[in-house]
Curated annotation (Swiss-Prot):
Membrane topology: Single-pass type I membrane protein; Single-pass membrane protein
Disulfide bond entries: C71-C192, C331-C340, C355-C363, C387-C392, C394-C417
Protein name stated in the entry: Fusion glycoprotein F0
Record bears the keyword Coiled coil: yes
């Protein structure tokens, strides 16, 4: 029963979903959207490598025409004095690093850099690298400083300076545009004092901006490099022209700046001409044609009154018909591009590939239980929500939004509701959904697996039960081991006594057996002896000895007396 006077069923906006893969290259965005996979962002893939260095000369004081009459611009003198005091520590730090590098051998040069860093109180690897860069760039900075006079004389905002060593630099006059448009024509007019005040106010604002941008460099130039974002502030509108003219690339200037890959380092300051030489490190960029890095957002989906969450990578690389997982951990991610030094993609399984291509029967889902889950996502002005797990209401027009039992998620655009309420959260819908979504999807029971570290109810209970049983067995084993240790001496004595008793028993039994055998043998011998005596006596009776007829017996010899 509907609770509002304006009931609506989103199933009228849907058609049946086929699980066949979508035609064309790339992932099946329409099919995946029905099971809770939403594409939130697509970016181009850029590769970059360490490039060469360029140099920028920043004029800390604009070129001014000579004032007419006896007009004395005291504001410029005060500005120069303040700026010199401000930059003196920076110049001393640079001199400390560079002067310690005057030794001839390479080993001494490196030792000089370390000594210079020790004098500045820094010692990290990044700071050593920055200091070495300052030393290496000092020769180029010296060549650039020799051209300071020619730089001072020009009135152009950007001018190319080429020394005898073909060192290329770009001379920037940060506030020259203001001078050209406001001050240059005004100095020839009357009222020098008002012009002096106007120049002073501009220079004071510029000085405030200067101290804010170069604060870290003023403390220690080898501590942190100057970011291109800070450099753009001080260079103003001239920086895009520099980037586009000097560093030929198809990338947008804002994209380059937001990447943070363009860095600057102060390498020299000329106090006489009030000029600062900055070394700019510009990487080499190459775009991978046809490659897209896609961010995927997952929400829970409904499957026959069961809440499940699909298992897909949060970021993928889509190139032609190839799909890879892409973490981009070592890459720089900007709003429109991903800058990497190498391809960070990793292969995926065949089942996951088929799933991303639109074969939903190959997808793996995890059953989830809990209250604070990803049940909705807002992308491109359209709301994707699992209304089987959340209370979905529309405030404009007022109604309850229902979700069919066979539908995975609900898609809400401006044609359905202009303001949607998800439990206690309110969202404004601003865009029209231009994709047809299905009302249901089929899923094999084997495709539901417990994978992610969510609240998995029964599975978690089984794991806890197994752990408790294992802990109980371990406790029993420990108790038995303790008892065995305490009874070790008793068990040893008892074992020895038992062994002696067994040996004695064996010896006794052996002696008895030997005695019995000897007795039997003696009895047999006695019996055999008796039989032999009886036999001989009987034989003598039956066979008496023969009569003796010898001569002696017939004629006895007379005895002599």
């Amino acid at each position: 029963m509907r609770l509002t006077p304006y009931p609506i069923a989103l199933t009228t906006l849907m058609i049946a979903l086929t699980t066949l893969p979508e035609t064309g290259l790339g992932i099946a965005r329409d099919a995946l959207s029905q099971v809770g996979v939403i594409q939130s962002k697509a970016r181009s893939l850029m590769y970059y490598s360490d490039g060469s260095s360029s140099f920028i000369v920043v004029k800390l004081l604009p070129t001014l025409p000579t004032p007419s009459g006896n007009c004395n611009l005291t504001s410029i003198t005060a500005y120069n004095t303040t700026l010199f005091k401000l930059l003196t520590p920076l110049m001393e730090n640079l001199d400390t690093i560079v002067s310690a590098n005057q030794a001839g051998s390479r080993r001494k040069r490196f030792a000089g850099v370390v000594v210079g860093l020790a004098a500045l109180g820094v010692a990290t690897a990044a700071q050593v690298t920055a200091a070495v860069a300052v030393v290496k760039a000092n020769a180029n900075a010296a060549a650039i400083n020799k051209l300071a006079a020619s730089i001072q004389s020009t009135n152009a905002a950007i001018s190319d300076v080429i020394s005898s060593t073909r060192t290329l630099a770009t001379a920037i006059q940060a506030v020259q545009d203001h001078v050209n448009g406001v001050l240059a024509s005004g100095l020839t007019e009357a009222n020098c004092r008002s012009q002096d005040a106007l120049i002073g106010s501009i220079l004071n604002l510029y000085l405030t901006e200067l101290t804010t941008i170069f604060h870290n460099q003023i403390v220690n130039p080898a501590l942190t490099p100057l970011s291109i974002q800070a450099l753009r502030i001080i260079l103003g509108s001239t920086l895009p022209l520099i980037v586009e003219s000097r560093w030929n690339t198809n990338l947008n200037t804002a994209e380059l700046l937001s990447s943070g890959l363009l860095t600057g380092q102060i390498i020299s300051i000329s106090p006489s001409y009030m000029q600062m030489v900055i070394q700019i490190t510009v990487p080499t960029f190459v775009m991978q044609p046809g490659a897209k890095i896609i961010d995927l957002v997952t929400i829970t989906a409904n499957r026959m009154e069961e809440e499940v969450l699909i298992q897909v990578p949060p970021r993928i690389l889509e190139y032609a018909n190839e799909i890879q997982a892409y973490t981009a951990d070592d890459c720089v991610v900007t709003p429109h591009a991903v800058f990497c030094k190498y391809n960070d993609g990793s292969p995926i399984s065949d089942s996951l590939y088929q799933c991303l291509k639109g074969n939903l029967t190959s997808c793996v889902f995890t059953p989830v239980v809990g209250n604070y889950l990803k049940r909705f996502a807002f992308a491109n002005g359209v709301m994707y929500v699992n209304c089987k797990a959340l209370l979905c209401r529309c405030a404009d027009p007022p109604m309850v939004i229902t979700q069919d039992d066979l539908a995975g998620i609900t898609v809400i655009d401006i044609t359905v509701c202009r303001e949607v309420m998800l439990d206690t959260l309110a969202f404004k819908i601003t865009s029209l959904n231009n994709v047809t979504y299905g009302a249901n999807f089929s899923m094999l029971a084997a495709a539901i697996k417990d994978l992610s570290p969510l609240d998995l109810s029964a599975q978690l209970a089984q794991v806890n039960k197994s752990l408790a049983s294992a802990e109980e067995k371990i406790a029993q084993s420990s108790s038995l081991a303790a008892q065995a240790v305490s009874q070790e001496a008793t068990i040893t004595v008892g074992s020895v006594a038992m062994l002696i008793a067994v040996l004695a028993l064996i010896a006794g039994c052996t002696g008895i057996m030997i005695a019995v055998q000897m007795s039997r043998r003696l009895e047999v011998l006695r019996h055999l002896t008796d039989q032999s005596i009886i036999s001989n006596h009987h034989y003598a009776e039956l066979n008496p000895p023969p009569y003796n007829h010898s001569y002696e017996s017939l004629h006895p010899i007379p005895q002599s007396h």
